[in-house]
Amino acid sequence: MSGTHGIMLPAFVVEWANPFPSSPARKTIPYLTSRTTETQEISHGVRCMSAQSFKASELQIEFCTPDQLKQKPPVSELVFGRNFTDHMLEIYWNASSGWGQPRITPFHDLRMHPAAKVLHYSVELFEGMKAFRGNDDEIRLFRPEKNMERMNRTAARSSLPTFDGAELIELLKKIVSIDQEWVPHAESSSLYLRPTMIGTEPTLGVQEPTEALLFVIMSPVGPYFSSGFKPVSLLADPKFVRAWPGGCGMMKMGSNYGPTLAIQKTAERQGLQQVLWLFGPEHRITEVGAMNLMVFFDKGNGEKELATPPLDGLILPGVTRDSLLSLAREWNEFTVSERDITMAEIVQAESEGKLLEVFGAGTAAVVTPVGAIHYGDKIIKIPTMEHEKPLTQRFFDSIKDIQYGRVKHPWSVPIE
């Protein structure tokens, strides 16, 4: 294989190509990855050949005893990620024998060696998705195959084992079904699912792990922001960078989030709610907090444009982002662009009265309206929620209608 270097492991092959190709090919790895032995390019020259996946049909279940069952908090007291359901899912992997049998067990602390790779080199990834209870009492997942695609891409980039996404979806349906009473009976709330994979090999060598653990925990959640559906204010400071070319900004790795916490605290000390991440000398917009960002412009002559940064390796390919773009293109009422957006363009649009709306998009909050951006000595005011029918609100309502089953849509996947 010219120009690449391959390392063969019993479980998969990872190949490194030139990380800065002149015209990089980007393909989406299917969520059904493990039924083929073909090598597939996934992103930025990284390739993965998966081993045989775990099987949902081999699931073992250990139910909680009555004394292990937890008291469920009132919906009004739910805080994001603080309470957890009665059960969890675990699947172990090692390089010699591959994936083990999936197990659903009572929720418990993890035990691992202090030299585990995850603790020293951040060999880790996670996903975020939700289960929703509709008025018909049916519980649904939202586009779970997209999370599986992204999880497999991140696994390959992290030198962690890939798997058959369809099998994990079946396991997610099963554990949600077992803990279904934890899915809130309220349309402002949902059950948050956190699939996670960590390298557990107990050695300090800087190399691919030969042992790993995939686990899933679940948490009932209310609205992500305590302020409700109200515009937030952002800190945009170009000296802080979240991601860079050739890096892993497009991957769902914990190492992308830990370094942002101190900057988030800086914003909060200034009375702001989130950080608007910029990149490069042009101060290009990338993400807001842990969300994708979208901007609605008035282009004049009755034309409007919904713009969002492109998937160029600096931002996460969000499921909500993809869903909003798909809806907007289906509506066909305004131009939809995936392109670079600079702060100079934002400043100019605001001065000309052409900056209509700015909002974040992500699983936790769906959409989050932005009312102001603090950028240097400027405070850019955005009338996101001041219009008679804000696009932000329309997106929020449209996604919620699908998630809670009020509108029938193939994105909504019943658990049974």
Please identify what each model-predicted range represents.
Residues P24-A25:
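Intrinsically disordered, low-complexity, serine/threonine- and charge-rich segments
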Residues I178-E181, A186-E208:
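Non-catalytic, conformational "gating/processing" segments within enzyme and secreted inhibitor domains
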Residues S2-F20, L32-T33, E38-I175, T196, ...:
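Helix-start/capping segments and mature chain N-termini
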Residues T28-I29:
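Short linear motifs centered on serine/threonine within intrinsically disordered regions
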